[in-house]
């Protein structure tokens, strides 16, 4: 967990695809 959100192997938040994630991270959590 990072900042209370689960993250994927890239360290991107995967809970709700929050604003501020880069395009790659958004694709990861769709």
Curated annotation (Swiss-Prot):
Q: Which residues form the signal peptide?
A: none
Classify the source by domain of life.
Eukaryota
Its Gene Ontology molecular function terms?
Answer: sodium channel inhibitor activity; toxin activity
Keyword Metal-binding on entry: no
What residues does the LCN-type CS-alpha/beta domain cover?
2-30
Keyword tags: Ion channel impairing toxin, Neurotoxin, Secreted, Toxin, Voltage-gated sodium channel impairing toxin
Instruction: Tell me where it resides.
Output: Secreted
Q: In which tissues is it expressed?
A: Expressed by the venom gland.
User: What remark about domains does the record contain?
Assistant: Has the structural arrangement of an alpha-helix connected to antiparallel beta-sheets by disulfide bonds (CS-alpha/beta).
Q: What does this protein do?
A: Binds to sodium channels (Nav) and inhibits both the activation and inactivation of the activated channels, thereby blocking neuronal transmission.
Name of the protein this chain belongs to: Babycurus-toxin 1
The species is Babycurus centrurimorphus
Identify the taxonomic lineage of the organism of origin.
Answer: Eukaryota, Metazoa, Ecdysozoa, Arthropoda, Chelicerata
């Amino acid at each position: 967990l990072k900042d209370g959100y689960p993250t994927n192997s890239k360290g991107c938040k995967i809970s709700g695809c929050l604003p501020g994630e880069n395009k790659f991270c958004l694709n990861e959590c769709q």
